[in-house]
Curated annotation (Swiss-Prot):
InterPro entries hit by this protein: PRX5-like (IPR037944), Redoxin (IPR013740), Thioredoxin-like_sf (IPR036249), Thioredoxin_domain (IPR013766)
Pfam family, one: Redoxin
GO MF entry, a single one: thioredoxin peroxidase activity
Active site: 55 (cysteine sulfenic acid (-soh) intermediate (for peroxiredoxin activity))
SUPFAM superfamilies: Thioredoxin-like
PROSITE patterns per record: THIOREDOXIN_2
Name of this protein: Peroxiredoxin sll1621
Record-listed E.C. numbers: 1.11.1.27
Assembly notes: Monomer.
CDD domains: PRX5_like
Function description: Thiol-specific peroxidase that catalyzes the reduction of hydrogen peroxide and organic hydroperoxides to water and alcohols, respectively. Plays a role in cell protection against oxidative stress by detoxifying peroxides.
Native source organism of the sequence: Synechocystis sp. (strain ATCC 27184 / PCC 6803 / Kazusa)
Amino acid sequence: MTPERVPSVVFKTRVRDESVPGPNPYRWEDKTTEQIFGGKKVVLFSLPGAFTPTCSSNHLPRYEQLFEEFQALGVDDIICLSVNDAFVMFQWGKQIGADKVKLLPDGNGEFTRKMGMLVEKSNLGFGMRSWRYSMFVNDGKIEKMFIEPEFGDNCPVDPFECSDADTMLAYLKGAEAPGVSEPVKAFVG
């Protein structure tokens, strides 16, 4: 069952801070669900893992590519969430060139678990990960969710049919979804 509101959790993030000495000027910063979603219109999409093929070739790059179109429809932030730590998410964002979509690490999987989207992916050596989904959130209230089919532990496939950027954009425009776009970037890995 989909919750009505985003769950209340604290995310462990890393932020740049020039007052931190040395070659790695970052510090830990806790961010609450209220800080992230409160008073904002947010599109959040969640995926199984940074650096994975579909996530790197289409899911994140297409949201990045369509960012201005989402903004024109009143979306304040687009957030990519994964059950990965802050260091992995940061390096993946650099490698992809993501500078518009915010990458949010759910390192302990708490948000994902409370959303009911945590699945076992030990068949791929991933452990506990997020199922692929997207949602439109208005001031913490979940207005629409697109959850990929075949939800379950150790699913032998990785569906990518409805959590894509084009489907969410079509929903916000009140239009028919055109289907998943072709990959935006080539996956190297």
